[in-house]
């Protein structure tokens, strides 16, 4: 298998310094220290809502949830002060917020999370504490399963240098680092739990995989992007090569147990009143088809056809559901028919891209979900996939530019994007002439739009024109990536089908 880094990229040169037997044990400590150093460099910059009253931003939302869970009875977590960053994530997020709030309140400074009076509180010490919680979460929850995934696929990339060069590029993907450690969120927790589920699928530990994925769902509802592919994969393992009804029952019990465990306080107190409120807060359909400008089908279509003026909210929900089901159906069917480990990442990627492009209530930051399974394809050691994986990462961080620019993270954006592409020699193109033209066109488009956005003010009549150009190009790119993941999934599954048919005939 050819390496993605056959031309000696800087990341490969870095890893090669640890290839000797006496130095290999130093590689992972140095890698972790480098990752933490990069996270802190990004964290020095501003965050979402910095010094922008009255509502501030995501930083204040996360801080407020620590305050809320610390001073409010559990039964009121999803009822209190809904106008001031009311809790709108599932209970595991609330538990984590409570845990960090306890640490900050009792071990550092109670003023940070004082009831009501701490709203909008900003200080260097609080920023340091909050940033530290994200970095710790990233290292403890996301990094270990990514390392395991890379190691599991190492049999296809036996070379120490090439294998770990791929791991570095996955760990340093710009979009996630900029959103979690710049803008400020805890996406690394949800993505880490999803990766733990995938890691356990690789080990055939289906109950553990189900448990971790349920935890991901109870941390952030956006993990639903992965629910159909993991369901059909697990269902496939229950019926192929023979029907295992006991496994299906065991997995079903695991789902019920995990959700019951997480929701137990609300079930115990008053499930008839409290559970509907949690669902209402977690799935706010009344907010509309999308928020802000997001590079999905509906927001892009709205620039030329005002769909929200033609269809009712309920009609849009039904239409988006139909489009989403159509987009994810092929990958789900393939994972059911061929529950093979080599199809996992591609199946997850294809289905989650379909969700991002066509589902209801999409945020621009949701691109991090399909980007994860797309990025870990680097660990599979196939040189032909690198141009598409690199394009997906560059398009993803490009689509986040309006948000990061608003946050004042321009320096971090350009530094990290340029560094990531340079150390991994990521701006490469497919040998296929058509694919090469498509990839080159998207890179040129991104450079042109960024240049216009930086140096030319938009027309006063169309203040969002540059953002709309960004959204349109990003959607076209994401749809292309979706088609690529689906096409590759179909190609590999057809080869599996042929191999199985030949074995039966033999």
From Swiss-Prot:
GO terms for biological process: dolichol-linked oligosaccharide biosynthetic process; protein N-linked glycosylation via asparagine. Keywords: Endoplasmic reticulum, Glycosyltransferase, Membrane, Transferase, Transmembrane, Transmembrane helix. It is found in: Endoplasmic reticulum membrane. Residues 1-24, 154-163, 232-247, 339-342, 404-408, 458-464 are cytoplasmic. Residues 46-132, 185-210, 269-317, 364-382, 430-436, 486-506 are lumenal. Its main location: endoplasmic reticulum. The chain crosses the membrane at residues 25-45, 133-153, 164-184, 211-231, 248-268, 318-338, 343-363, 383-403, 409-429, 437-457, 465-485. Pathway: Protein modification; protein glycosylation. InterPro entries: Glyco_trans_ALG6/ALG8. The keyword Glycosyltransferase applies. GO terms for molecular function: dolichyl pyrophosphate Man9GlcNAc2 alpha-1,3-glucosyltransferase activity. PANTHER family: DOLICHYL GLYCOSYLTRANSFERASE, DOLICHYL PYROPHOSPHATE MAN9GLCNAC2 ALPHA-1,3-GLUCOSYLTRANSFERASE. This is Probable dolichyl pyrophosphate Man9GlcNAc2 alpha-1,3-glucosyltransferase. It comes from Schizosaccharomyces pombe (strain 972 / ATCC 24843) (Fission yeast).
């Amino acid at each position: 298998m050819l390496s993605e880094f056959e031309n000696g990229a800087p990341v490969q040169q870095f890893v090669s310094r640890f290839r000797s037997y006496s130095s290999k044990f130093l590689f992972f400590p140095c890698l972790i220290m480098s990752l933490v150093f990069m996270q802190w460099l990004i964290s020095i910059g501003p965050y979402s809502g910095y010094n922008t009253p009255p509502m501030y931003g995501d930083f204040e939302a996360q801080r407020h949830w620590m305050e809320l869970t610390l001073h409010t009875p559990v039964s009121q977590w999803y009822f209190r002060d809904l106008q001031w960053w009311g809790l709108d994530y599932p209970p595991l997020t609330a538990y984590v917020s409570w845990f960090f709030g306890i640490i900050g309140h009792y071990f550092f400074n109670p003023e940070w999370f004082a009831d009501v009076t701490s709203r909008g509180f900003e200080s260097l010490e609080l920023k340091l504490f909050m940033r530290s919680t994200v970095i710790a979460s990233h290292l403890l929850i996301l990094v270990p399963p990514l390392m395991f995934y890379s190691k599991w696929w190492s049999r296809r990339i036996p070379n120490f240098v090439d294998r770990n060069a791929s791991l570095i590029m996955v760990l340093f993907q710009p979009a996630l680092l900029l959103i979690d450690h710049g803008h400020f969120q805890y996406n690394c927790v949800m993505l880490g739990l999803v990766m733990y589920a995938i890691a356990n699928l690789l080990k055939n530990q289906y109950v553990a995989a189900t448990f971790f994925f349920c935890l991901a769902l109870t941390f952030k509802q956006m993990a639903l992007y992965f629910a159909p592919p993991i369901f059909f994969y697990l269902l496939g393992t229950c019926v192929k090569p023979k029907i295992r009804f006991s496994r299906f029952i065991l997995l079903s019990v695991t789902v019920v147990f995990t959700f019951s465990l997480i929701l137990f306080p609300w079930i115990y107190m008053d499930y008839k009143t409290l559970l509907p409120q949690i669902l209402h807060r977690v799935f706010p359909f009344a907010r509309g088809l999308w928020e802000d400008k997001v590079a999905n089908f509906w927001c892009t279509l709205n620039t030329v056809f005002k769909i929200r003026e033609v269809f009712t909210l309920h009609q849009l929900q039904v239409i988006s559901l139909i489009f989403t089901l159509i987009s994810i159906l092929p990958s789900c069917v393939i994972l059911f028919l061929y529950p093979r480990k080599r199809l996992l990442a591609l199946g997850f990627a294809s289905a989650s891209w379909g969700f991002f492009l066509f589902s209801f209530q999409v945020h621009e930051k949701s691109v991090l979900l399909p980007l994860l399974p797309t990025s870990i394809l680097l660990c599979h050691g196939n040189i032909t996939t690198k141009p598409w994986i690199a394009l997906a990462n560059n398009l993803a961080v490009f689509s986040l530019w309006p948000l990061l620019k608003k946050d004042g993270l321009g320096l971090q954006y350009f530094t990290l994007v340029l560094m990531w592409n340079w150390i991994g020699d990521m701006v490469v193109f497919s040998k296929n002439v058509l694919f090469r033209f498509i990839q080159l066109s998207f890179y040129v488009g991104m450079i042109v739009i960024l240049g216009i956005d930086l140096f030319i003010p938009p027309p006063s009549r169309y203040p969002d024109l540059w953002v709309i150009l960004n959204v349109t190009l990003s959607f076209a790119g994401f749809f292309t990536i979706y088609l690529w993941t689906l096409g590759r999934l179909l190609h590999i599954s057809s080869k599996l089908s042929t191999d199985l048919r030949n074995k039966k005939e033999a």
